[in-house]
Amino acid sequence: MFALENLKEDKRMKKWMYDCVLETPATAEAMFKNKDALVGKLVDLFLAKDYKKIVMVASGSSYNIANCSKYAIQNYLGVKVDLINSVTYAKYDYKFHENALVICMSQSGKSTNTIEAVIKAKECGNDVVAISMVPDSPITRYCDTVLEYGSYGPGDDVFVCRGVPTSTLYFILFALEAGVKKGAYPKDSYKKRMKEIEMIIHEMPRIREAIDQWYNANKEELWSMK
């Protein structure tokens, strides 16, 4: 394990990045067990209309989440997914997405660019969903349909390193549930993927421990690199 004890003598920081890494498997496991309730609303929204594509609008860590989940969503749902930076969407790209479900993503719910994108999507008459990690965040005041990833917990994930893998999991679970209900993804493949996801979550602590061991065995060489 990384040596954090000395760093934690600085009392200004309640939680370190590695603490959030340690919390990720338990958060992912809880989300997986609660997947029906967690992604159910987004599944219902998507299935309510014959959307031709999904537009994921995001920046920062949310953009990474969208990148991680884009191709899984396309594969499981059988619809095109566009990934657009929040500023680009709000300033230039908001006009070109007919028959699309626009998902505006902000981990904190405070991104002013993503909030502006929500406003633009509504002005264009698009169906828009805002999703964040934090309940009652500022973005909730600008969108009628607001969802939560289900990964928020006491102490918050100030580094968003817990949020990236768990929020990616949220979208993969959404796509699988919606895909099988839509008939776009076979039931036997759905069951196989769910078992794989459960196995991956279970193995996350072991993988992290193996990475710790590798790092400690090679850190001198890594530190010497220029």
Per-range role (PLM):
Residues 25-28, 178, 182, 226:
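Short amphipathic alpha-helical interaction patches enriched in hydrophobic/aromatic residues
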Residues 2-30:
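N-terminal amphipathic/basic leader segments beginning at the initiator methionine
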Residues 10, 14-17, 51-59, 209, ...:
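Glycine-rich phosphate/diphosphate-binding loops and the adjacent beta-loop-alpha structural elements
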Residues 16, 174-215:
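Internal, active-site/partner-interface "lid" segment
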Residues 26-33, 78-82:
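Short coil-to-helix leader/linker segments, especially the first N-terminal amphipathic alpha-helix
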